[in-house]
Amino acid sequence: MQVKNPKFEISAVSKKQYPKGDRPEIVLVGKSNVGKSSFINTMLGRKNLARTSNTPGKTRQINFYNVDDIFYFVDLPGYGYSKMSKEEKVTSGKFIEDYLQNGTNISLIILLLDIRHNPTADDMLMYDYILKSNLPFIVIGNKADKIAITKVDGEIDRIKKTLGISYTTCLPFSSERKIYGDKVWEVIEEKIK
């Protein structure tokens, strides 16, 4: 997909701030610091549209990115950041859950995992939650640039085995090398038709 004019739309802290209308939403979920913002920037061909940080847990609201007035990338707060207080974790968890339960325009959920590591307990909980939601989703093994290209398929197989994936699409991705994005676009384009 050729993206011409993506733009940041809004950071929402409540449902009443969500964009109105029926534009499809491609929702990104994943642990803090898994690379959701870098994923958005790479997919949209922009360097700093989504703000990135080396500090986990920076995204505390839901960020909507308007992609050519066709669909939204929706960046949910990261989960599993150990330095968040219990209260912050509960609040963040409820915020994510409320959005996933009540989002009427969700066309696809993308669960981003770090390809280098086994899915964590938090990743497993999120995967199970998404599975039970009956919403369409894919799993992406992000940061594929951090491993040898010859090991990518094996790491994807390991993630699939750990999660028990048999039918869900599971793809590698690298913001650094800007590779594998074409396969992700194929899935997204199918869902936003």
Describe the predicted segments one by one.
Residues 58, 71, 78-81, 116-118, ...:
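Conserved nucleotide-binding/hydrolysis micro-motifs of P-loop NTPases
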